[in-house]
Curated annotation (Swiss-Prot):
Catalytic activity of the protein: a 1,2-diacyl-sn-glycero-3-phosphate + CTP + H(+) = a CDP-1,2-diacyl-sn-glycerol + diphosphate
GO MF: phosphatidate cytidylyltransferase activity
Principal location listed in the UniProt entry: membrane
Biological process terms in GO annotation: CDP-diacylglycerol biosynthetic process
Domain of life: Bacteria
Keyword vocabulary terms for this entry: Cell inner membrane, Cell membrane, Lipid biosynthesis, Lipid metabolism, Membrane, Nucleotidyltransferase, Phospholipid biosynthesis, Phospholipid metabolism, Transferase, Transmembrane, Transmembrane helix
Protein source organism: Brucella abortus (strain 2308)
Organism ancestry: Bacteria, Pseudomonadati, Pseudomonadota, Alphaproteobacteria, Hyphomicrobiales
Record family assignment: Belongs to the CDS family.
Protein's name according to its UniProt entry: Phosphatidate cytidylyltransferase
Membrane topology: Multi-pass membrane protein
Length: 270
């Protein structure tokens, strides 16, 4: 079986599980989001092992688990974010000499990713649509950028970070993201206006930046993949880097234009 076939099969299986848990929502999706965050933190600490200490690992795991418990107990977004930021601050101060900002960055990256995904879904009727909108934008970006880049080639997007990504792939991915976002948004709101396409474009751009940033992190530690958990895709970070970056932006957008704990109203503020 070729790497592309393995990649496609893994994507189909993961996509099916993800969409089912998104439909279920509630605690099920929250646990799924926390599992993603925990996997991200594991891979981050393994990648940056030379910047970690026994304390940073133990403290990071404990703080991330408690953050997840706060999410499950639904203690409020601001409290959970505040708790997460406090933990990152402690790591930054206590581990700066040995690890610089790597331990704190890993905790925030994993924790805020889990929090963003969980709160975007929430328990509201349109939480499902909100997450599907995010998936449509990011997956359209990933799939189209991959195949468009391979078919058209052309100038490299950021060869210092990721030698295989091209401008043709990035532009094609962004265009597909706008189309995918418009399709999903049309299910819950009347067509028209500039809000949805602009948001979809921004999410696509941030998704691709998140992908490049994760590639940069791997290069800092001489790694090709973040892990081996996902056949054909490498690690969890390799698969969700763009998704969690876009989720963070969409969460912030919803928190500003709706409210931190109930984000589905984002579709009615354009």
């Amino acid at each position: 079986m070729s790497n592309l076939q393995t990649r496609i099969i893994t994507a189909i299986v993961l996509g099916t599980i993800t969409l089912w848990l998104t439909w279920v929502g509630g605690v099920g999706f929250t646990l799924f989001s926390i599992a993603i965050g925990l996997a991200m933190f594991y891979e981050w600490t393994e990648l940056s092992a030379t910047r970690q200490t026994a304390f940073s690992r133990l403290f990071g795991w404990a703080w991330l688990i408690v953050t997840g418990i706060l999410l499950i107990l639904d203690r409020g977004a601001l409290l959970t974010i505040g708790f997460l930021v406090a933990g990152c601050a402690i790591l930054l101060v206590t581990q700066w000499k040995s690890g610089r900002g790597w331990p704190a960055a890993g905790l925030f990256y994993a924790g805020f990713s889990a929090l963003s995904l969980s709160l975007l879904r929430g328990d509201e009727p349109f939480g499902f649509t909100t997450i599907v909108f995010l998936f449509a934008v990011v997956w359209s970006t990933d799939i189209t950028a991959y195949f468009n880049g391979r078919a058209l080639g052309g100038p490299k997007l950021a060869p210092r970070f990721s030698p295989n990504k091209t401008w043709s792939g990035a532009i094609g991915g962004a265009a597909a993201a706008v189309a995918g976002g418009l399709l999903v948004a049309s299910l819950v709101a009347a067509p028209g206006g500039w809000g949805v396409p602009v948001l979809a474009l921004l999410l696509s751009i941030v998704s691709q930046i998140g992908d490049l940033a994760e590639s940069w992190v791997k290069r800092q530690f001489g790694a090709k993949d973040s892990g081996r958990l996902l056949p054909g895709h490498g690690g969890v970070l390799d698969r969700v880097d763009g998704l969690v970056a876009a989720a963070a932006l969409l969460y912030l957008f919803g928190a500003i234009f709706a409210e931190p704990d109930v984000l589905s109203a984002i579709f009615f503020s354009f």
